[in-house]
Amino acid sequence: MSFSLLCDKNDGALLDAYPEGGPEGWRYLVSQRLAAEYPSGGLTMGFSPNFPDRRKLYDFVDSILEIRIVSDRVRQVIQELTPRDAEFLPVTLVDHQKDVVARDYFIMNVIADRDVIDLERSTVRMSHLLKDNISRVSELKLKEDIPPDGPKLFRPRHLRGYTMVDPTVQAALTTAKLTGVKFLPANGWNGKYR
């Protein structure tokens, strides 16, 4: 079974802070539902003041936070195809002057996780703080016996800040012509986005 890494690194607006008033930042990196404790009216996230020229808004918004911020178009595709794999927490996006630029964006909180990484064959460095999490990838190898059933969009165990998709999700997102995203083959990935 093949999987791809969902890569939202692009030249558009960049977010560099978790929304205030919601769950603590680290909780967005754990495969758990947060909607019950998330404010019903949503939260606000702002463009990074460190990158004032980055103003373009794509369907996938670049972030240094290891979370996915996506448009309603992305939400619709994912909820139609694999509704149990993620929940969508509403955010209003504001620009560098704190003016609202979009109200139809969401934190795509990936609930599903899968054990797909072959740690023995991969060339990785494990985190000193989170002992079961990979901190650096030189060459990622996936297990050869991954069952075909299971989540289609998920956090790979040991790489919790990343999102992987199966070919059906990749095809659906590509067919929808969503912007600001690319897909990198997970098997053999060298840890770089380019």
Spans of model-derived segments:
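Phosphate/anion-contacting hairpin/loop surfaces
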Residues: 1-194
